[in-house]
Amino acid sequence: MLHRLVRHILQPEGVFYTMLLHRKSVELLAPAGTWEAMTAGIAAGADAVYLGGKHFNMRLHEGDFNFDDARLKNAVDYAHAHNVELYITLNNLISNEELPALREYLAYLNEIRPDAILVQDFAVLELVHEMGITVPLHTSVMMNTHNEHAIEKLKEYGITRIVVGREMTLSELALFRARTGIEVEYFMHGDMCISESGQCIHSGVLFGQSGNRGRCMKICRWPFALIDEETGAVLDADSPGPYKLALKDMCMYRSIPALIQAGVYSFKIEGRMRSPEFIARLVSTYRKAIDAYIADPNGYTTDEEGWRTLYDNRVRDYTTTFAFGQPTAVDIGMTGEREPRFFSQAVEEAGFADEVLRAERPMEKENAPSRHLSVRVGTVDAARAAVDAGADTVYVGGEAFRPNRPWKLTDYEDLVRYAAGRARVVVNTPRTTMRRECGELEQFFAALNDIGVDGIMVGNLGTLKLARTLTKLPVQADHSFNIFNHLAITFLKENGLTMATASYELSFQQLRQIVENAVLPVEAVIHGAYESMICDYNFPAMSLPNYSDLAAPELLDRLYAFRDEAGGVHSIRIDQYGRNHIYFAKDLCLYPYLEKFSGLGSYRIEAQDYTADVTAEIVRIYRAALDRLAAGGDGYRAAEFDRLTEIAPRPLGIGTYRFRQSRNSI
């Protein structure tokens, strides 16, 4: 008989509860990309397996992997016959043209009765409710769930388990678990992304193959040089290697007690593309360790033979990433020596290769507003410049990139007075809102009610819930919501939002389909510097021996960048929370094609990385072009386009609009 451990966890209100730790207190969750891998994982001791169909999941590169519909049913039956649960991944973004197939697939999954479906796209939540689907729902890690307010919102839609964001420490996770009571799944072994989940768009924009749609080309495994952006000088010549973003593989084998005591229920192994033998080895090794701890926690010690098995059969070297604190350079495989496969190599980003875009018909939307121009800025001076140049809305606040400082309450008050009668002032919020950010936002939102701003831009479900609870201001969704279809916008409207910003990864066709079917106005970015990924890592600190939070100001405020092998320079901007925002090498510019976007609810300029003077000139040019279009004329002027090119701090291009569509999920 198993010994049982009584574990006490402090609840927020100060009440203790007890949980008897036994064999079913922890789930060992194995991946399966083939029938053989599934049966091997089950035979080795997995409590549950997760796998994907031939479409709508995050592992679509290999045609020989994943399960067709008939095999899915057989897999469910096989797992249940062996008293093992089976979860099906439906965890990528779904475009409008794929929605009919999604309906059919959901109906089929409801028939074959897996134990849960893993989801990312809000459209799935909408359809599950509409269709009466009764299969339990778990959030995918791609939903980037990282605060308790998002959990409370997701519970309203029947979510019973979350795969937590990889950036959470175990101490944060324990508090998170205690406050929400939600079941927690945690990636504890395997390949990890260096970007925050769901917030890397590099592959989708560059190759038309979105990491959010199961086709990541792994730009993070490219070699890069760290440079001084202003001088071009290489700063990391003494670095162990050029693979600055190549995170090592997660391995929590030596930390199983810490995982269990943090309240993790499901121990998730990554590896749906791995062989049956590889999966069996991992599962059996972790099975023995978990069972040994549960049987006798006080007498438990790491089985070094098991560790030797994992170490000798590793793909990359191992790391615990954020489990016990901020990762450092030792967590990155900079030499690239153990990298098993390179999916792509550096190429130049798209310029104005616009044959596809020029051939498209314009958007059509009844009652579309008359050329509303919004501008996101980084400083008070840039905000005033945007107002003076003719912006209808300015987005202010949120992340502040060094050397700029965060906005103060008095800055908002002054700008509201300055813009009165000329432009709306909408407050931006950080894209990522962990415990610190949420605490700060609660106080900030309470103050906003008296300042007179015109609205709030939110970047995740938790911030949405806070804004709707603590203010009476209009709330709109930023591009970080990864809006890829009109049903996701329906979801946002049901939750009180007034406008949604489209994903950067959409092609023009896909954006047009959303705009023409959406129940809310849709905003799209038409010009500006935009981020390829956001990372909770400090890349300058990883490469520069003298760099730390206590470094000299000239080191902290220097502008850093990564240079890829194609010569592209990717700016690195560090915000007040220490996160690193990596930019594309070319800024987006859709000036020559504005007439195509006539159905938009708002045309947006991303000027957060621009000076006040550059911001003013860009806004004036777009204001004039949009006004000409509104009057029925031609918006384009060659001299204006030339001027945009001259003043741009980076080369210009059209990003994902070079593609007819982001490669599909079916």
Where are these regions (language model features)?
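Generic start-of-chain signal for non-secretory N-termini
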Residues: 2-29, 164
